[in-house]
């Protein structure tokens, strides 16, 4: 059986809403989470951002995903990609299981490689709302 929420139930951020937990290490820049949004404080993964990219799958349930100023409702079997440094929040009114991967884009290709310059960097430079665009 998979462990839900890996021992924590609240996102901790600094004054800019940057998440303070490390997602992997410099040597291994990848972290897999298996979480139930319902088990988090106030049944949400509150506003935060990080320099890593994130893939989130809704394995079971329904959740509202707020990414920048946009809202997406995802159901079982649907997924979302969250770009680097983009403010986001997840909430649910029921138990909703979300396996997710948070990792450095450099895991895909080295910064000085053709793959990075041609395919990865343009995705990372896509203009999305920044953490500063969200008001309390």
List the model feature ranges, each with a label.
Residues 85-106, 115:
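Ligand-binding loop in jelly-roll beta-barrel domains
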């Amino acid at each position: 059986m998979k462990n839900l929420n890996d021992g924590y139930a609240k996102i901790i951020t600094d004054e800019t809403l940057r998440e303070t937990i490390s997602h992997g290490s410099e040597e291994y820049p990848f972290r897999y989470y298996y979480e139930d949004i319902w088990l988090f404080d106030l049944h949400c993964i509150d506003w935060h951002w990080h320099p890593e990219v994130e893939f989130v799958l809704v394995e079971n349930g329904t959740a509202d995903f707020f990414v920048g100023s946009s809202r997406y409702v995802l159901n079982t079997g649907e997924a979302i990609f969250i770009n680097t440094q983009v403010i986001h929040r997840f909430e649910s009114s029921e138990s909703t299981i979300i396996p997710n991967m948070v990792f450095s884009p450099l895991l895909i290709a080295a910064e000085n490689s053709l793959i990075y310059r041609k395919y990865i960097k343009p995705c990372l430079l896509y203009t999305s709302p920044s953490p500063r665009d969200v008001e309390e």
